[in-house]
Amino acid sequence: MLSCQIQGNGQESIALCCDFLAQRLSICMDIKMRNTFEERRKELLQGHNTTWVNIFDSTCAYYYAVTGQTERIPTLFGAHMLSTVNFLAPGRPMMEMIENQVYLAQGEYSKVIGRSESILAMCQALHYDLVALHVQIQLLAANWKLGKTEQALELLRRSLSQAFPDGILMPFVE
């Protein structure tokens, strides 16, 4: 696995990206994880780098939200304390998208609708089309759950037309 080759090379940020990908793929594929979430978090804590721990917590929050394990979502996201953490501006849209996923998993559909416009604006400013696609899908799910089927179907059409030319399917699977 790529993350095993990166481990120990001082490329922890890339290893965290690999962890996130492996977590996401494990939802729909039989993928053996290198460590449990608890073991990986313990490794990161030994490095005394809160940025890495917060990034890992964000990936766990996303995984647990998507899989419906809301009781396991790390406190930073589960209690919606994201605003207490400083992230570099380029990372903010992704973190907000993950928090949106947590709100969705917690049944806070109106909150997802209310937050999505500002997240989409951040995505547009930074040209983060993939994060924007995730947010649009969250928005359509929230609208659907609230019985706003016309808005949800329009968002689905828009999202599909945006994703299919590039063969982007993972956000729809999740």
Please tell me what each predicted stretch does.
Residues 73, 93, 100-104, 118, ...:
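Residue-level detection of beta-strand scaffold positions
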Residues 5-21, 31-32, 44-60, 83-98, ...:
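Alpha-solenoid helical repeat architecture
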Residues 1-3, 31-44, 69-83, 110-120, ...:
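Alpha-helical repeat scaffolds
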Residues 25-26, 64, 103, 136, ...:
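Residue at a conserved register position within TPR or TPR-like alpha-solenoid repeats
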Residues 59-68:
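Basic/polar, acidic-poor N-terminal "presequence/leader" segments
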